[in-house]
Each structure stands twice: as C-alpha cells, then as structure tokens.
Amino acid sequence: MANIREIQSRINSVRDTMKITNAMYMISSSKMTQAKKKLTDTEPYFYALQGEISRILRHIPKLEHYFFDQRETTPAEERKIASIVVTADKGLAGAYNHNIVKLEEEILSRPGIHKLFIVGELGRHYFAKRGVEIDTNFQYTVQKPTMHRARDIAGVLLDQFMSGDLDEIYIVYTRMENSVQSEAEILKLLPLERSSFNEMKMPLNVYREAIDLYPSAEAVMDSIVPNYVTGMIYGCLVEAYASEHNARMMAMRAATDSAKDLIRDLSILYNRARQAAITQEITEVCSGAKAQQN
C-alpha cells in the first residue's frame, strides 16, 4: 500500500505542475497577441519614415551626413562596436535566450572594442559573469515594451555615436517569422547603409518630382533618422517580446504534453499496483480461511 500512496502522490504532483504550465501557456498566449497588435499598429509610421529617407537619397544621391559615415579610416581593431542585446528576464522559454547569447558571442569574436547594452536580466547576468564590458547604467526590462523606452534607448546610443564614442551599433534580437518559428537576428542600426534604402529604384530617364527640404537636407535628416532608429529599436523590442512568449508557449505546451504522458504512465502503474495489492489481500484471506478449516 505504501507503493500505491507513493505513486498517487507523484500523480498529484505532476497534475499540479501541469496546471502551472498550462496557466503559463495561456498567459504567454495573451501577451504575444498584445505584442503583435502593438507592432501592427505602429509599423506604418516607421515604414513611412524609411520611405522618406529613401526619397531624400533618391533626389540627393550624393548627400553627405554623419549618420551615413562609415568611418572607414578607423582600423578594425580600434572600432568601437556597441550591441543592444535583447534577452528575456526569465527562463522557461526553450532555446530563446541561448540563441541570442550565441549570436552575440559571434559579434564579440570580431576585431574591435566591444560594449554591450543589455535589455533583459538573463543576458545581463550571463555576460557579467564572463567579464564582458556592460553599460551598468543601462537598466531596461523587456516586459511590456513602450515607445518611451525605445526613445530612451535610442537617445543613449545616438548621443554616443554622434560624439564619436561609438563607431557601429547593432541590435541582437529574435525575429518572429510565424507562429511556430522564430530566429535570432543581428540588425545594424548605425551607421546607416545607403543600399538598404535603395529598394525603390527609379530609371534615370523617369521624371523625379521636385522636393524642397527646409531648412536643409541635413536638418531634415537630423530629425528623421533619430525617429527612424527609435522605430527600429521599438519594433525589435516588440518582436522579441512576442518571440519570447511564443517560445514560452511552445515550451509550456511540450511540458504539458509530457505531463499528460507521465500521468498516463503513472496511472497504469497505480492500477497495476492496486490490482496486485487487492490480489495479495484476497490470497491472504483465502490462505487464512484454509488454515482455519485445517
């Protein structure tokens, strides 16, 4: 009977765990839906900014601006490279955090002076233990990404880029391809690449509408680019947040399915043990009855 009680205790424990994993699945499902709606609502504005930058470059192909300065004269070993690394604040999300960390370690293996700006507690703890230089004043959570937070992050990075403290800025995040697949990705924020704005190409003999830029093209770029970078960061934060909860949903679904399988196996063991115990009791009763008859 002790064995039966032990099996029953394990079944109850697994059932309690299954309730937790199922609840976490439902919570992550709700948060992922909210994040995807945020991204859908704000994407048109930032696509419009990208279109305006492309339009300006189309009309002024030789426009010189420090946001496009590749700083080619700086040797690779002396280039100051910043990475915004977007991880989760907690685990239980499958390989989500591992994939981000692995991708950032590839950047750290490149020549240059590296500096990390970590969004998310797990990434902050991971790289701090390995002695990588981290901006300790950069304390941002990944939970419920907002435009205000993205603007603060962009402000910190833009100031350091314009002052010459940084030569390149990347963001490492997880892009959600569909409801079942996400992929860790590196996106270059600064300096801007002209080629990335050349998608809307026009033949040379096609009339190009005249545009007036006041007070100057440089001043217009000074206004548009920071908003564009802010939008890119916000989009990455929201997409990473959705990807995190998508990964957690899949992990919790797998855990729930495993719990169901374990409960089924334990139930079979429980029934066998109970049947054996009943058989043993019947055998003992029959043996006792025969002993009394003799």
Predicted regions: what is each one?
Residues M1-N294:
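C-terminal beta-strand-loop-alpha-helix "lid" module of Rossmann-like NAD(P)-dependent dehydrogenases
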